[in-house]
Amino acid sequence: MGIRTFRPYTPGTRQASVSDFSEITKTQPEKSLTTYKHSSQGRNNRGVVTSRHRGGGHKRLYRIIDFRRDKHNIPAKVAAIEYDPNRNARIALLYYQDGEKRYILAPADLKVGSTVISGEDAPFEIGNALPLWRIPLGSEVHNIELVAGRGGQMVRAAGASAQVVAKEGNYVTLRLPSKEVRMVRKECYATIGKVGNADVRNLKLGKAGRSRHRGKRPHVRGSVMNPVDHPHGGGEGRAPIGRPGPVTPWGKPALGAKTRNRKKASSKLIIRRRNQS
């Protein structure tokens, strides 16, 4: 992926940058692998806002992604690398030898014409999916299962990868992108390599309109509201919030308050939390 910048013809183009989409080889999605995606606009079934700052945005077709990689021991050819509006990563269209078509997350350096395969006996190559116990120490992996057969749930964002650091008993230890170190059952599958399109973090929107196209509405600070609207509101000019610490619009502690359930069963599998130095 390359980054394209603009001359400052307008204030919006002065700072803006976009992907050059040089890695995209097919512009229209595979029709059989798409479905309609209803946008909830941040509302629940009663029409009440449950997630603020959402609404508008361009309509999207959802691409059905194969996170399970459960088509074992059947080779597939990479037919195209495509854009997906629902995620930062690119997706790869696979043609299996038996005629089935599927989308997967496109790893970095995966080329059109390459062959990928999943299974216990799959070779150690980019894009192949193997059980964690078959992957060598020090390897980069992504799309990692937490429960065998459920499908990849971790490390799916553009440019992300986890590292296999140890194997002991029925568990494999991984270092995640957040620096958290945790154990995962050895029979869980993961895909070799890191997710592509890593330069997406270097893009700049340049103007508010591009954020609105993505379905994001303005995020207004509580300190500039009235007291009726937010606990931080009110006062003369730029007044302090008048509390020991910041809170949400509903008065609960925010910005650093722990939200993880202390009794969560998976806590015993986490060796080092992400927020520990």
Swiss-Prot record:
Any Gene Ontology biological process: translation
Molecular function GO labels: rRNA binding; structural constituent of ribosome; transferase activity
Keywords, comma-separated and alphabetical: Ribonucleoprotein, Ribosomal protein, RNA-binding, rRNA-binding
Region (Disordered): 1-20, 27-55, 207-277
Any single Pfam family the record assigns to this protein: Ribosomal_L2
Biased composition range(s): Basic residues: 207-220, 259-277
Gene3D superfamilies recorded: 2.30.30.30, Nucleic acid-binding proteins, Ribosomal protein L2, domain 3
Compositional bias annotation for Polar residues: 27-48
GO CC terms: large ribosomal subunit
Summary of the function given for this chain in its UniProt record: One of the primary rRNA binding proteins. Required for association of the 30S and 50S subunits to form the 70S ribosome, for tRNA binding and peptide bond formation. It has been suggested to have peptidyltransferase activity; this is somewhat controversial. Makes several contacts with the 16S rRNA in the 70S ribosome.
Matches recorded under HAMAP family: Ribosomal_uL2_B (MF_01320_B)
UniProt xrefs under NCBIfam families: rplB_bact
Subunit and interaction comment: Part of the 50S ribosomal subunit. Forms a bridge to the 30S subunit in the 70S ribosome.
Family assignment from sequence similarity: Belongs to the universal ribosomal protein uL2 family.
Protein name according to UniProt: Large ribosomal subunit protein uL2
Species of the source: Gloeothece citriformis (strain PCC 7424)
